[in-house]
């Protein structure tokens, strides 16, 4: 089997594709000096969907671009990928920042929304099909984006993250922070967690993003309890109750945790899976409605 890099070069040569990750400047409001990269496939769909992909602590936008198979799916299905990057706080997202946790107040979240708006305008993208995903700190920020800007995102997928506002009030949100209460499984009632979401955008009564939560049961950096707390939060916000567990889905090591009929909220907990849970592009993109 050809290594992935060689296979990609072979496919590029065969098809004449030349799309690549590109840095974008001057996209709009950027209160925390974050960076924007995009991957726009050569064969762009009419009114393309957008996925915002958020890297983990210590990562970068280019490293996360290389970290999943999303670019190859973008080539096949014609959607756009936005890769934000943060140079702040050991390259960790500001999930503790009151501005990021509040609709329209600033922080990383406002800069990311500005990237989305820029991309929609530039490529005539479909504003009703904007999605967000991320790993570790990016998974935490995925929950923040879905909670703080629900009108922007149709659905999200958080890998190895924590509930929205779990790090609220902490001095920082890195693996080196002295306060690791959140990452060790801070607990609230579903209603308390739900109120953190509702209070991030007071008065909002519109639809809320559908969510997937992925986590490893052997994660000793961001404890598995964090995923269960995130599921409690979104079950309250989305108004769906736990319905069943399904063993061996999407693969043998995992248990699928289904809420309601599974169309709004699903969790995946992996036995023997550490930090971070691997990205399952196919399951995620099916949930988003971007592939069959």
Curated annotation (Swiss-Prot):
Keywords: Carbohydrate metabolism, Glycoprotein, Hydrolase, Polysaccharide degradation, Secreted, Serine esterase, Signal, Xylan degradation. Gene3D superfamilies: alpha/beta hydrolase (3.40.50.1820). It is found in: Secreted. It catalyses: feruloyl-polysaccharide + H2O = ferulate + polysaccharide. Residues 1-18 form the signal peptide. Its main location: secreted. InterPro entries: AB_hydrolase_fold, Esterase_phb, Plant_Biomass_Hydrol_Est. GO terms for cellular component: extracellular region. One of its GO terms (molecular function) is feruloyl esterase activity. Pfam families: Esterase_PHB (PF10503). GO terms for biological process: cell wall macromolecule catabolic process; xylan catabolic process. Disulfide bonds: none annotated. Glycans are attached at residues 88, 117, 179, 245. It is an enzyme of class 3 (hydrolase). Its EC number is 3.1.1.73. Involved in degradation of plant cell walls. Hydrolyzes of the feruloyl-arabinose ester bond in arabinoxylans as well as the feruloyl-galactose and feruloyl-arabinose ester bonds in pectin. Belongs to the carbohydrate esterase 1 (CE1) family. Feruloyl esterase type B subfamily. This is Feruloyl esterase B.
């Amino acid at each position: 089997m050809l290594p992935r890099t060689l296979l990609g070069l072979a496919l590029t040569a065969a098809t004449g594709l030349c799309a690549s990750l590109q840095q974008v400047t001057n996209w709009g409001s950027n209160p925390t000096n974050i960076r924007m990269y995009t991957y726009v496939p050569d064969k762009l769909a009419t009114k393309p969907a957008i996925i915002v992909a958020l890297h983990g602590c210590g990562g970068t936008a280019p490293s996360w671009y290389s970290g999943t198979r999303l670019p190859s799916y973008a080539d096949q299905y014609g959607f756009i990928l936005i890769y934000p990057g943060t140079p702040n706080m050991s390259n960790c997202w500001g999930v503790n920042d009151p501005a990021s946790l509040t609709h329209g107040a600033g922080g990383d979240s406002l800069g990311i929304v500005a990237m989305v708006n820029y991309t929609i305008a530039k490529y005539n993208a479909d504003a009703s099909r904007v999605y967000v995903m991320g790993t570790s700190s990016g998974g935490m920020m995925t929950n923040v984006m879905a909670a703080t800007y629900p009108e922007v995102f149709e659905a999200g997928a958080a890998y190895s993250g924590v509930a929205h506002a779990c790090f609220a009030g902490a001095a920082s949100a890195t693996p080196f922070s002295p306060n690791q209460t959140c990452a060790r499984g801070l607990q609230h009632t579903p209603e308390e967690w739900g109120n953190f979401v509702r209070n991030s955008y007071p008065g909002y009564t519109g639809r809320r993003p559908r969510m997937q939560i992925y986590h490893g049961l052997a994660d000793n950096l961001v404890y598995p309890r964090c995923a269960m707390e995130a599921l409690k939060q979104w079950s309250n916000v989305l108004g769906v109750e736990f319905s069943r567990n399904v063993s061996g889905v999407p693969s043998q090591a995992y248990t699928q945790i289904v809420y309601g009929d599974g169309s709004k909220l699903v969790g995946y907990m992996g036995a023997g899976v550490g930090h971070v849970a691997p990205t399952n592009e196919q399951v995620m993109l099916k949930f988003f409605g971007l592939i069959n």
